[in-house]
Amino acid sequence: MQEWNDIYDEYRNRTGRVHLRGTPWKPGEYGLTVCVWVYDGSGHFLLTRRAKGKSFQGTWENTGGAAQAGETSRQAMARELFEETGIRAEESEFEFLGSDRDKCTFYDFYCLKRRISLKRIVLLPGETDAVMWAGYGKIHWMIRTKKICRIIASQFRRQESELKKRNLSK
């Protein structure tokens, strides 16, 4: 199934045009990707392992993905979280952490407090194949040993102070 994404300009305005996922972006075109750090209130974050056949296969990541055409950032976050983990959350439950931009993507970062047994997580076949809770220490070790996807490792480093400011370890 083809996936279409809204095209944004450099100021993050929707252009009214759409982009077919997997095709190159033109200069000055941007997509929107959302990421969430699900935390349990006890200093642990939910991580999933990327399935075989995906880029960065076998590495761990937080939940996220591209917003589809017509979706808001929060709508995309709720959809991605449900698709990849089976966790349902209202858009209003996501706490906004901040945004970033690279050469063709705007990123929105969120956190979500949710205590849930790993047995209740429903992984999306072909996307992820394992799940765990990991604290700051374990995440730092996983970054050093390259067990976390390098893109996610970079995001975590940029978001860590904001996550700690929000006292997500309690």
Language-model segments: which ranges?
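Conserved hydrophobic "DFG−1" position in protein kinase catalytic cores
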Residues: 7, 38, 47, 111-112, ...
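Unchanged
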Residues: 66-148
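A short, polar/proline- and glycine-enriched secondary-structure boundary/capping micro-motif
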Residues: 26-28, 56-61, 132
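Charged phosphate-binding loop/patch that engages nucleotide di/tri-phosphates or the phosphate backbone
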Residues: 148-170
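A glycine-rich, hydrophobic loop/mini-helix early in the fold
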Residues: 33-64
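Acidic, metal-coordinating catalytic segment for phosphate/diphosphate chemistry
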Residues: 1-35, 39-41
